[in-house]
């Protein structure tokens, strides 16, 4: 279905409910530059570090795209997707069933869920929705939950310390969204809905947060404008 969530005035706080879940795949493909390409890049990198029965957990797994694609490319993995949206989990389960892949999707708060024993943990555009006071605690939990040779993949929207550059990058992103078919009204509505809900960090703040949690090797494997993907090794 086509994303039309923000083509009408906002009447409630943004949440990942049934209305959003029903169009979320289209929303991601049109709102996140190079979304499919980035996910495929992460999978192609990650599969080289994985062995049979390794546990991989996707935090904020939404409709399950990442784990389903990983399952199609590499078999015999213990794949778990966690999301606190029941509507997202329902769609993820239906998609996994349709593709005939084995992935466990759990409706839970990953801040409370036991992540221990994971070879890899993935969070694509998820951490940015965690309140800053809880964010460092989550990253430390991820580090502690990984095996000694574990990997954390994190994609985030970014801000820059230079205010003029930040405005330029935001304008470039809004131009991209217009090219993808969103109206200025829809863009403005979504910006208002996500204000104080999605709280991005700078590149350096994200790297420092990963270092403070204990990660020693951190690389940026993808970047477009104000979007980036980090890989961190325990």
Curated annotation (Swiss-Prot):
InterPro entries: CmoA, Methyltransf_25, SAM-dependent_MTases_sf. Keywords: S-adenosyl-L-methionine, Transferase. It catalyses: prephenate + S-adenosyl-L-methionine = carboxy-S-adenosyl-L-methionine + 3-phenylpyruvate + H2O. Pfam families: Methyltransf_25. The keyword Transferase applies. Its EC number is 2.1.3.-. One of its GO terms (biological process) is tRNA wobble uridine modification. The keyword NAD does not apply. GO terms for molecular function: carboxyl- or carbamoyltransferase activity; S-adenosyl-L-methionine binding. S-adenosyl-L-methionine binds at residues 35, 60-62, 83-84, 124, 191. Belongs to the class I-like SAM-binding methyltransferase superfamily. Cx-SAM synthase family. PANTHER family: CARBOXY-S-ADENOSYL-L-METHIONINE SYNTHASE, TRANS-ACONITATE 2-METHYLTRANSFERASE-RELATED. Catalyzes the conversion of S-adenosyl-L-methionine (SAM) to carboxy-S-adenosyl-L-methionine (Cx-SAM). Homodimer. This is Carboxy-S-adenosyl-L-methionine synthase. It comes from Nautilia profundicola (strain ATCC BAA-1463 / DSM 18972 / AmH). The lineage of its organism: Bacteria, Pseudomonadati, Campylobacterota, Epsilonproteobacteria, Nautiliales.
């Amino acid at each position: 279905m086509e994303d039309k969530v923000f083509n009408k005035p906002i009447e409630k706080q943004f949440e990942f409910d049934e209305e959003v879940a029903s169009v979320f795949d289209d929303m991601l493909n049109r709102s996140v530059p190079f979304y499919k390409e980035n996910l495929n890049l992460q999978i192609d990198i990650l599969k080289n570090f994985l062995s049979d029965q390794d546990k991989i957990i996707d935090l904020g797994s939404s409709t399950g795209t990442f784990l389903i694609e990983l399952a199609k490319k590499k078999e015999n993995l213990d794949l778990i997707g966690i999301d606190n949206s029941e509507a997202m989990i329902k769609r993820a389960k239906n998609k996994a069933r349709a593709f005939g892949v084995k992935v466990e999707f759990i409706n839970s708060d990953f801040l409370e869920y036991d992540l221990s024993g994971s070879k890899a943990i993935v969070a694509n555009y998820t951490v940015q929705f965690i309140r800053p006071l809880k964010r460092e605690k989550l990253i430390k939990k991820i580090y502690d939950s990984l095996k000694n040779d574990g990997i954390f993949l994190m994609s985030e929207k970014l801000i820059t310390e230079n205010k003029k550059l930040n405005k330029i990058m935001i304008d470039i992103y809004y131009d991209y969204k217009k090219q993808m078919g969103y109206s200025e009204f829809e863009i403005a509505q979504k910006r208002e809905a996500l204000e104080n809900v999605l709280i991005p960090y700078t590149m350096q703040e994200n790297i420092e947060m990963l270092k403070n949690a204990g990660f020693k090797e951190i690389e940026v494997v993808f970047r477009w404008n104000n979007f980036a993907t980090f890989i961190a090794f325990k």
